[in-house]
Amino acid sequence: MEYRNSLMWKELNEAPAVIADLAAKNACVMEKLAKEVKGKQIDNIYTAARGTSDHAMIYFKYLAETLLGLPVASGAPSVVTMYGAKMKFQNTLVVACSQSGKAADVMEIVRAANECGGVTVAITNDENSPLAKLAQFHLCCFAGEEKSVAATKTFSCQLYLALMLAEALRGGKVCPSLGEALKNAVAAIDAATDPVAKAFLPAEECFLLSRGVSSAIAFECGLKLQETCYIRARAYHSSDFYHGPMAMIGEGTKVILFASKNSLTPETDAVHREDSLKCAEKMTELGADLYIVTDDADAFAKTGAKIVCVPGADSEKLTVFFFALAVQMLACKVSCGKGLKPDSPRALKKVTITK
């Protein structure tokens, strides 16, 4: 299949237009939710999600902890569904994320939080889903039906709703022109991902690295390469990778590093860049076949890595949206180039329900 004929390609390209209208469509609910959270003196956040949705919650965790100073726990629904734990969700905002809104284990977390006085919000792509109805508040992706098994536009929408939520809780606003900026960047990202897609056609394994906000994209890239390309892809926070997994790097091992030009604040830009450079230099020193997805090509020009230069923004919290498109395009191209079907990977269904 030619990748441009796939549903995955069609749907990932719909994300910019959907994002452009997302803030207005969720503004009323977001205002009420922010008021409720402040009124109940919420002092911690708990997220419940699986797969791609959980990667969107990694993004939210970094935003909430850095911008709001609120600790965010990435929940393990099995604690409730398999062990029967009675969680104390008082003074807790529970954010449940599921594209279909049918995740049974995630719903059990919301039910438990509702029963003991927590504030619950669901992020789904279906206003009439069980999860949307169970939570006290619902933020909708409004992405339309997503037919490809691999989630693309819904992931971008989840990221945007996570950003909206973090900004609403601190009294800030989201970038109103992000959708238009993404639309204008599609052609450049398409061209930038061509060389790396060709290089990954024979790949059977690879590692995806990043640190901080962009880690969400590294983990999503790993999942996309696993499910659509059948590549044994493993994602790590680069700081964790040094503690053992780095021993797997040998001559020619494929590694993708995600590194944005700007951090969340100008004060941390230099530290962020230095950390990414350190990681890049270490990977090339070990002989890795390193690709760096970045909006800061000049900073990595001397690392010896292959640069995948994509457009970015003035903050890492926005640049991740451009990285997300790059990851989705890469996976779609590699899958089709391998003669696979990205829209219907083997052994998978569009809706996965775990309990």
Task: Map each language-model feature to its residues.
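Alpha-helix N-cap/helix-start motif at coil-to-helix transitions, marked by capping-box chemistry
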Residues: 10-13, 129, 324
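Active-site phosphate/pyrophosphate-binding segments
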Residues: 3-42, 137-141, 145-256, 338-355
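Glycine-rich phosphate-binding loops that contact phosphosugars or nucleotide phosphates
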Residues: 31, 38-183, 211, 252, ...
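Peripheral docking tails and interdomain loops at the edges
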Residues: 312-355
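Tryptophan-centered motif/residue detector
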Residues: 1, 19, 59-62
